[in-house]
Amino acid sequence: MSDLLNQFQSSSEEIRRAAITAASGSSDGEVVQALIRHLAEGSLSESERQLAAESLGKCTLPEIAAILLPMLAAESALTRTMAAAGLGGQQSAAAITALVSGLTDSVNTVRNWSERSLLGLISAVQQYGVESLIALLSHEVRLSRSPAARVLGLTQDERALSPLQLMAEKDSDWLARMAAIKALGDLGFPEALDLVTRALQSDPKNRVRAAAAEALGKLRPHNAEQLLRAALDTDEDEGLQKSAGEALRSLGFEVSAINDDGWE
């Protein structure tokens, strides 16, 4: 048995945690099995099991999915969370489908880890997950709609353009609108410019307007400087001003610095 595998069985949590960290991304079947056993060991601390899940999430051996996918349906929210984290290295259609479903989980940590894993698997999401993510944009729970939008933006898939525009314009929840506006910036299609500009100028929620400023910086319209400087001049919200200033800088324009008291 290798030294690393022996360290997994140490009575010292410090040594075990070091072994878990060293095993991150391993392609050794025995090491991966040790991580899986660690993840499932109920006598260990939650943080140690979570660390094992995160290390497992960087491993790409396909047999991991067969073990973890059923765990996403477990009664224990902690088990579902660790399964979502541990699937972070799996690029199969089954893994992507399961992680997209994880965005609808009733527990926040499961949703968060499902999103985090999907964000690290964008090429596989492009292949297997776009349609199911689009379907989630109309989910009744905003905390499922928002992460679906964020992941979709990074796919840069044209199929997401119209659904994200509809969400950005019509969703009654500002968190969902903010996610959709940000996603439109990441998506990168100029067809979204008019909607993003309207959001910058007139959305009632300051954080949506700030997201629109960020999105304009990514979409890079010919009049970006004019739009962003107008927002700086007319919108007193500091979050919006910070986003507009950062967008201007990203486009190569000079802008005053911002400090804790506002713009200098």
Stretches found by the model and what they are:
Residues 13-14, 29, 44-47, 62, ...:
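Alpha-helix N-cap/helix-start positions at coil->helix boundaries
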Residues 14-26:
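Alpha-helical segment of the N-proximal tetratricopeptide repeat
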Residues 1-7, 28-40, 61-73, 92-104, ...:
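Amphipathic alpha-helical scaffolding segments comprising HEAT/armadillo-like alpha-solenoid repeats
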Residues 17-18, 33, 46, 50-54, ...:
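Alpha-solenoid HEAT/ARM repeat scaffold
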Residues 46-123:
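A generic tandem-repeat structural signature
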Residues 182, 186-246:
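Ankyrin-repeat and related helical/solenoid repeat scaffolds used for protein-protein interactions
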